[in-house]
């Protein structure tokens, strides 16, 4: 969740607890009687996990602003060279969508000038949208739950928000939107 922008707990702390078979219990300082969130090996949390998986689909929403969307149209060879240059310069990409005719990805705006310089060196068409935000829904078995993207699209459409790009994993679904549409 932290890597998606949530202000929760450092991933290294989770890793240390996992390696030592320790259950972390995250409490709410404003409501100490609330049970909070337990993080630990699935075998140790089996009962709690099974109960919550039946009742809760989404468990958190995280967000990050200052994201840029980059779309590139060019040959596979050019794009491979671009990726190599980005790797050499330690520029991370996120929300990667590679289609036959175009490639799209998101990145932190702090890397935008450097990426644009790389793109200008190659014979590719590109489009950059700098004022974006990533909203991530974190939940249980996201990719195994039918209709998730349809529900998200209905919610976005109801608020006249354009979905610029999306990506998913087993436990999360991220939506790239205009930064002005993200309300924190």
Predicted regions and their residues:
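C-terminal catalytic "cap/lid" subdomain
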Residues: 1-168, 172-184
